[in-house]
């Protein structure tokens, strides 16, 4: 009896690290700036059938409408209230999305913008997505309500009121991030307003939260807010389930604030992951894939059960945030597919796949001057629907990386090999590497400038397997390269360095 209660207690304490996805659903996808009605459809027609565990959505709460530049993507990170109306849809559409996605086993993770309100220069008026009045100059947000007493101006010690020195911990947490009005999260009143908002989302059925700008909040303030949260809605989650928490903490190693400061609250975003993986696949600074043998904690990353990992995110794919020019994105599609394949095959961390929109990149002196451009929209500012082409790709400038065969099939690969150990590593000392996941899956990469032809131990049962990168198994038929595994687990692999996708992945569910 005692052991049962102990396990129950541990479960209650550690729930915030558990993604709450269904068993054997091991990844989420960020449908950046998608409309709620498109997400609901995507859950039903694509994400559920292909084993995706959940969706990170753009902030669902009311934001300021910025007209100079014209409705940039970052206006959604400038709250005016916690009402549920944005360019992605209204509260009715939001509730419909959460219900429909949950009903097919795909959960919703909300991007929670709780560190701040809108920018100090956002003016006064009702230019907000629900039409709520606000006055940024006097810090008056009656739709919450917040007033000047609810902000950190008196606590901030920098001259400008903005963060000027990232080596000064209190500045980073008490001053304004790029002039965004910094909420006084030390006040119980403010904590309660935020918790009310998050609890409303929990009641609707969301599964967890990405805590935006967590680095700019004191960990104990975040904890105080999380302590006020309800358990998840028992209609879709086991009784007593805690919301999954992952905190945006950009820690590349050069500052006093560490990702580990936030482990008590939940997982953290491991920004070193994509930055380093990009450097390796681009072969910069003498890096090579052979060095990935001890990938994960061996590279100085946070512990695997505290990490949320990704190749790129909505910030760093356009030069914001962290990682610089090493970050791989859909613009570098060949390397991007390899990076995504490596991430989804490797056991480290909980994986998030990016799904982007195209924008007109324009570089001047190494900076993309169009990095602000918002989602594909109509003349009236409404977001364009995600249309689906005959070949299953998306139209209207939606990139839909999560629908690329190579990435979707690796999401499935990760589900198949879930819980299996990292095994049978091989490398050629350069940029040809391979590894398995127990006796369930095997993957091999050729990122060298010459072809690969080798027989390796796969750890897999004997038989003929269909490569899920160059094609896939459809019924009893393989549209791709076939790999023959002998009775001793050995198989021969041939990958030309000019191949469209210079990697091969096989798993037990792709056995013919």
Question: Whereabouts are the PLM-identified features?
Answer:
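Alpha-helical scaffold elements lining the catalytic groove of polysaccharide deacetylases
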Residues: 185-197
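Short glycine-centered, acidic/aromatic-flanked micro-motifs in structured strand/loop junctions
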Residues: 31-33, 84-86, 213
């Amino acid at each position: 009896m005692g052991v049962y209660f102990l396990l129950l207690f541990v479960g209650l304490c550690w729930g915030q690290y558990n993604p709450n996805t269904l068993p054997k659903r091991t990844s989420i996808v960020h449908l950046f700036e998608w409309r709620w009605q498109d997400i609901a459809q995507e859950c039903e027609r694509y994400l559920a059938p292909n084993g995706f565990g959940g969706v990170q959505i753009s902030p669902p709460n009311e934001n300021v409408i910025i007209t100079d530049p014209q409705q940039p993507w970052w206006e959604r990170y400038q709250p005016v209230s916690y009402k549920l109306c944005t360019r992605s849809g209204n509260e009715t559409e939001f509730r419909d999305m959460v219900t429909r996605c949950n009903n097919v086993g795909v959960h919703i993770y909300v991007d929670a913008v709780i560190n701040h309100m809108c920018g100090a220069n956002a003016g006064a008026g009702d230019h907000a997505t629900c039409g709520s009045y606000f006055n940024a100059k006097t810090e008056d947000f009656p739709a919450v309500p917040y007033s000047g007493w609810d902000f950190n101006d008196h606590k901030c010690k920098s001259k400008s009121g903005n963060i000027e020195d990232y080596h000064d911990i209190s500045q980073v947490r008490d001053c304004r991030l790029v002039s965004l009005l910094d909420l006084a999260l030390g006040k119980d009143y403010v904590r309660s307003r935020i918790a009310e908002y998050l609890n409303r989302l929990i009641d609707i059925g969301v599964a967890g939260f990405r805590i935006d700008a967590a680095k700019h909040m004191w960990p104990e303030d975040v904890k105080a807010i999380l302590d006020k949260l309800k358990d998840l809605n028992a209609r879709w989650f086991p009784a007593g389930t805690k919301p999954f928490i992952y905190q945006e903490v950009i820690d590349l190693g050069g500052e006093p604030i560490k990702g580990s400061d936030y482990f008590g609250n939940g997982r953290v975003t491991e920004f070193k992951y994509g930055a380093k993986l990009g450097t390796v696949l681009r072969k910069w600074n003498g890096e090579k894939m052979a060095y990935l043998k001890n990938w994960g904690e061996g590279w100085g990353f946070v512990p695997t059960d505290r990490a949320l990992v990704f190749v790129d995110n909505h910030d760093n794919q356009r030069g914001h945030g962290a990682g610089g020019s090493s970050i791989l994105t859909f613009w570098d599609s060949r390397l991007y597919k390899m990076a995504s394949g490596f991430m989804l095959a490797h056991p480290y961390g909980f994986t998030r796949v990016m799904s982007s929109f195209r924008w007109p990149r324009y570089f001047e002196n190494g900076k993309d001057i169009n990095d602000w451009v918002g989602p594909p929209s109509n003349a009236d500012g409404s977001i364009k629907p995600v249309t689906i082409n005959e070949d299953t790709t998306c139209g209207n400038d939606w990139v839909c990386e999560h629908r690329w065969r190579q990435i979707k099939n690796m999401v499935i690969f990760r589900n198949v090999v879930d819980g299996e150990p990292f095994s049978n590593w091989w490398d050629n000392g350069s940029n040809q590497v391979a590894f398995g996941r127990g006796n369930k899956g095997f993957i091999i990469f050729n990122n060298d400038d010459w072809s690969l032809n080798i027989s390796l131990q796969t750890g897999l049962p004997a038989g003929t397997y269909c490569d899920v990168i160059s094609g896939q198994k459809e019924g009893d038929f393989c549209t791709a390269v076939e790999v023959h595994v002998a009775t001793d687990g050995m198989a021969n692999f041939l990958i030309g360095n000019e191949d469209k996708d210079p990697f091969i992945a096989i798993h037990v569910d792709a056995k013919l």
